[in-house]
Structures are given as structure tokens and as C-alpha cells.
Amino acid sequence: MPYLLEMKNITKTFGSVKAIDNVSLRLNAGEIVSLCGENGSGKSTLMKVLCGIYPHGSYEGEIIFAGEEIQASHIRDTERKGIAIIHQELALVKELTVLENIFLGNEITHNGIMDYDLMTLRCQKLLAQVSLSISPDTRVGDLGLGQQQLVEIAKALNKQVRLLILDEPTASLTEQETSVLLDIIRDLQQHGIACIYISHKLNEVKAISDTICVIRDGQHIGTRDAAGMSEDDIITMMVGRELTALYPNEPHTTGDEILRIEHLTAWHPVNRHIKRVNDVSFSLKRGEILGIAGLVGAGRTETIQCLFGVWPGQWEGKIYIDGKQVDIRNCQQAIAQGIAMVPEDRKRDGIVPVMAVGKNITLAALKKFTGSISQLDDAAEQKCILESIQQLKVKTSSPDLAIGRLSGGNQQKAILARCLLLNPRILILDEPTRGIDIGAKYEIYKLINQLVQQGIAVIVISSELPEVLGLSDRVLVMHEGKLKANLINHNLTQEQVMEAALRSEHHVEKQSV
């Protein structure tokens, strides 16, 4: 039986750099292939070649789809063939309805007039196919990220898709939304639709894949049956070496209390009747890693936004640093108290995409390079930039390159470098490894461990429970704005954390760390 897709000996160069070097990929109808590799390995470049974003003639090699050679000059050419890609950054127009998004550019018309009745009927069938119980007239901006992801799939199905490419589809989804999405992909597989699945979440890769293809440094390392591979096997192929322990287990001691929060309550920015954080109190010691776990809507991010002075709504409570009550109402006041934060959404809140990597790193610490006459010392700034890039192992061709062109992992390292320039005593990390590859995660985990050994106190918020449990000395469990448990991490399990989140009473372990 012929393959649905064959990519033969694909090579793509940018100047003298080979982003893809003689890579081949093939899959059958109804097959799910996971494409794995570190950020910058060439996965996205390969998919852009396949989809026509990089047109025929700009690369070497051959693409055969459904028995015919594809020589696409535009993404529309491959869409007509039945190839659709859904990027991590969804391409929906939030101001339009679900129906309008699904049929955007593919409207059903009769004599130049759109047939809304027929489109509504078709839209309802597509939504049912992806198990989405919403009205076609719902505004996309009113949907959650998980629902928007399913609308994207419905949009692809409307184009008679035969091959669906999903790039980091669950990076911003809850566990429940992820489970729904994986079930939808399996259902599409039963209807003969093939899928190329790109994800750094190896548990998902193992759960969904028939075959796993690994790319490293632009080269094809190997393709194997998923059933015969462990997560460690995938990691070794991706990074070219064994990671003996993903989470550093180097001992570190905690000091005295550096931070205490008492009776923190925060209200919704618009609806004052809704409490997003409800009477939360906790403390933090020097050299301690404090994890905050909870389901979406638990109030984790809202809590630390109050601490960093960036919560947009009203809040009340007391913050003590070194035993003294402090008033923090903006990020400048937080920084002055020795607090730095890596935000949850790095693209929205963490970087200026068009600004140079170096300028992003020094953005919050320009006073360090400003003399008495308010003139910037360019030489001192450049020296600091180069030292930060080297220390954090930020992979960039130049400090002057726009940071938006870096991989997610290297953007995150640059944000961390900016935080460290502030010489923080308390470092807040909100989803520190979201959407970055396993190698970059490992480097960030090692850095966190080094920081706490220097006495810096770290707060880690993550939707990935293994990450919280692998890093933290102590875990706060939140649910619906309330602190449900304060647990010492003595071999804590995911089940214990979830049980604590959902139990009715508050639970605190009183042992010292």
C-alpha cells in the first residue's frame, strides 16, 4: 500500500546554515507520527516546507502526497491537497463567530450570496465531529483555549483534511482539555486522517503515537515504533546524551524566613463580587523552592501577581519581607524589595519581540549602566549582555538579533537572565518551562538548583505536577482561590496533591523543612 506522505531527502538552507539536512519522513493514511526534537532542531522548518510556507524551489528534495508530487508555491496549494497545520499560536479571529472562523476564505455562496443556512448546518456537523457543544454564533474570543483548539480542528476538517499537523497543541491546555483533544485525534485516525504531532510533552507523545521520528540539529536521527520506546529513549535521541536525572537532586539547606503573606484576598478586576484569591497565607524561606499547584482557576497566578504588584484588580492583605511589612502596588516596588518574576505568558508579558536579545536582557536593569548624567554606558551594557548570554547559555547568532526569532527555550533563558541582573532575593517562576524542549528544561532546572544554593528563595508555579514535585521542597495546593494544603515534599505523589486540592478541609503539615 503506498504511503500517504513521503518527504524525500529534504534540505533547506538559510545562507550557509543548513536548517534541514537530507531529512526523509513518511506516513500512512490514519497513522499518527510524533515529530520530536529540541527547539531549533528543524521540526518547524520541515513542516513549513511540507505546507508550502517555504515554496518549491527554495529547498532541495521531493514531496509526494497521495501519489502525486507537490510543488507548492503557497500554503493554499497544500490546503487544497488536504494538508492542514494548526500552530501553537492559534490563527483564529477572536472578534468573529465560530461559524465565520470555520468558513473564513471558504464561504459557501450561491450567485455571489453567502448561504448562511447551509453554512450553519455544516458548522453544526463539524462541531459535533470534534465533540464541541456550542452555538455556531458564539464569538471565538469568548471560548477557552481548549475550545478554540477544537474550532481550529473543525476548520481543518471543513477543508477536507487528510493530513493534520498539530504543533504544540496542548501547551496552554488543562489536563482535561488535553484528554479531550487526544480522544478527538484518535477518532479522526479511525476515519483515515493522518496526523503529525509535535510536542515536548513526552507522556502525550507516548500515549498518542504509532511512530516517533526524532530530528536533532537538522538531521534525521531515527524513526521507531512508539510501543518499543520509553521516554528515556526519546530523550537520548533528542539531546544526543542520557539525562541521568531530569530534576537535579543536589542537597541545599534553607535559611530563615524571607517572605510571609497574611490573609491575601484579591477580587476580579471587573466583578468586585468574585474573589480570585480568598484569604491565603503562607511563608517562604531563604534557599527554599516553594511549588504552587492547582487546577486552572485555582488562583495561583493571581496570588503571585499581587506579590509582584501587577494584579489589575483590588486586593488586600499583608506582605512581610525580612519581618517588615511592605507595601507593593507595582512591579517597581517589588523589584526594589528584591523580587523578580518570570511571567506565565512570555510572548505577551515577558519579551519585546522586535527588540534585540541583549536589550531585552538589560531592559529592567538600565540603572546599572547609567551614570550621574543619565548617559548609558554602552560598553558596560554590552559586557554584561555577553556575560549573561554565556552564563544562561542563550543560543543566538548575535545579541542584536530580534528576540522574537529565538526558540521558546532561549527566550525563556533571556528572561531569566534579565531577572538575575536585578540580583533578586526572591525569584518567582510562573510556568517556567511551558512550550520548551527537554534539553532547555534540564538547563533551567539546573539553574534553579544553583540559585537556591546561593540562598535565593524560589516560587515555582506549574501546570505540570511532575515538575512541581520534582523541584519543590514544599508544595502549596490551591483550589478555587483558597489554600487547601501546605505539604512538605517527602516523596509526594500527584495523587496526594490532587486529593488535597479537592478535599473540603484545609490541611497543613507542620514539620519544618
Curated annotation (Swiss-Prot):
It is a peripheral membrane protein. PROSITE patterns: ABC_TRANSPORTER_1, ABC_TRANSPORTER_2, XYLG. Coiled coil: none annotated. Its main location: membrane. ATP binds at G37, E38, N39, G40, S41, G42, K43, S44. Its EC number is 7.5.2.10. Belongs to the ABC transporter superfamily. Xylose importer (TC 3.A.1.2.4) family. This is Xylose import ATP-binding protein XylG. The lineage of its organism: Bacteria, Pseudomonadati, Pseudomonadota, Gammaproteobacteria, Enterobacterales.
